[in-house]
Curated annotation (Swiss-Prot):
Residues 1-21 are annotated as: Disordered. Keywords: Carotenoid biosynthesis, Chloroplast, FAD, Flavoprotein, Isomerase, Membrane, NAD, NADP, Plastid, Transit peptide. PANTHER family: PROLYCOPENE ISOMERASE, CHLOROPLASTIC (PTHR46313:SF3), PTHR46313. The gene is CRTISO1. It comes from Oncidium hybrid cultivar. It is a peripheral membrane protein. InterPro entries: Amino_oxidase, CrtISO, CrtISO-like, FAD/NAD-bd_sf. It is found in: Plastid, Chloroplast membrane. It is an enzyme of class 5 (isomerase). Up-regulated in the flower buds and flower lip tissue, while it is weakly expressed in leaves. SUPFAM superfamilies: FAD/NAD(P)-binding domain (SSF51905). This is Prolycopene isomerase 1, chloroplastic. The lineage of its organism: Eukaryota, Viridiplantae, Streptophyta, Embryophyta, Tracheophyta.
Amino acid sequence: MLCLSLNSSSTSPPKSPLHHSFSRRSMRSWVCSPRVQRKKLGFWSSPKAVLSAVSGAGSEAGKVEEAEEYDAIVIGSGIGGLVAATQLAVKGARVLVLEKYVIPGGSSGFFQRDGFTFDVGSSVMFGFSDKGNLNLITQALEAVDCKLRTIPDPTTVHFHLPDNLSIRVHREYDMFISELVNYFPHEKEGIRRFYNECWKIFNSLNSLELKSLEEPMYLFGQFFRKPVECLTLAYYLPQNAGDIARKFIKDPQLLSFIDAECFIVSTVKALHTPMINASMVLCDRHFGGINYPVGGVGGIAKALANGLVNKGSKLLYKANVTKILLKDGKAVGVKLSNGREFFAKTVISNATRWDTFGKLLKVEDIPQEEKNFKKIYLKAPSFLSIHMGVKAFVLPPDTDCHHFILEDNWGRLELPYGSIFLSIPTVLDPSLAPEGHHIFHIFTTSSIENWEGLSHKEYEEKKELVADEIITRLEKKLFPGLKDSVVLKEVGTPKTHRRFLARDSGTYGPMPRKVPKGLLGMPFNTTAINGLYCVGDSCFPGQGVIAVAFSGVMCAHRVAADLGIEKKAPVLDAALLRLLGWLRTVA
């Protein structure tokens, strides 16, 4: 039996660019219909799938009773939350996921317009390989008996940078290094030495069984099995990519290129990007590669949600959590905006830390550790996003799927609207658009402060003005005739992202206030409130698909240990958590 379909053609067009809606008829068809052609679907499942993972607005996947106590409640169904939930469900825990919206996925969701299927967030998908231990999306799907069909991307990203610097990051590592050396022959040795450092970290991480770094029995077990790899990671934990790069590279333009590489990873330059984060991305794009799921990125969350239900746990949509309930200082449940309350032994928040500790808890309940977190990290900016349907003639032959554009001034890299990230997923999967058309998905940084205090008319006019400027830049740099090719356009601002993704200020995630000590300051999954855990991009190791999936795996392991499902050592637990807490204070 097919697990899910990724192509629901009867979607009614909602009002906002990030609003996703479904008709009950189309949802029943992708769950139940055995006649849908397999090649039009993104994945397969074992013959267990019976319930829809997307049951419609305000409905439930699995009957949800308020009086029932769960082992874990997960607030939000982003990739981090879904990985944590499914990993716990597979271990036998009874999990309830509460999603504010009407489909799962958050930033990894999708929406449809006039035959176009758009990814809400990034189309650059890591974690789908069939080797190593960092193929975390593959592992998460396999755990719930699902598999997605994917299309390999031969080029991770094509950089278009100042001084006509045009570099393709080829899937084949040697091709990428050769292209980079061709531009910077005098830095040949430095290039290889810097990226070799990245590989040293990646290979160490990729060799380990990935579980919670807050669980001492696992941590010590890995150390005794792989001492060299563990010591390697410990050595690089407090270091940043920019410092390592400067040990080997002197050319300022090449260092600026590495800034651009890291900016894609973390929204900050290399000197502020932890070396471990950079290494995961800069190496996995060549090891496992970028692989796009057939039918769109939204299929990942839909598969995990469906798998969660198949494993006996539950998912409630249109469930807006407004409060985390505490009893004697312990998290015991949540309250929804409609007054419903649900109770569990543990609560896992997939919201940002600003939402979790700024909105879901009373001010007097916020621990000092979370106040310290806000002293080290601030909210990264949000994005202006433009989703467009365009006529196919505008694409030159052999156009790459992903592009990063910074035309004439390295100093504009981090500024609002300074750099542009463009995805054209139809280069890989034409089924996402009507015949003869392509999808353009454009991102550029923007802060919510720039969109506040406007009347509706002023807001709409500003959206059109800023979008037109961005499109004009793309037309001038890469795609002559782009404006005339546009058949559909949806513009999302930081206010859009705040509303539909439930992220404070629409933020991309945490960003260090000053030069960080690598990842030392980044909290793990446990919090100072007993029974409350966090998962997602506000936790170690940070932003990105691999990172939030890793966070989900770690969180599930730690929660399972605390529930008694996994082995634990209470005395060692307390000592390790104190040590990790102390390390964060020196960051």
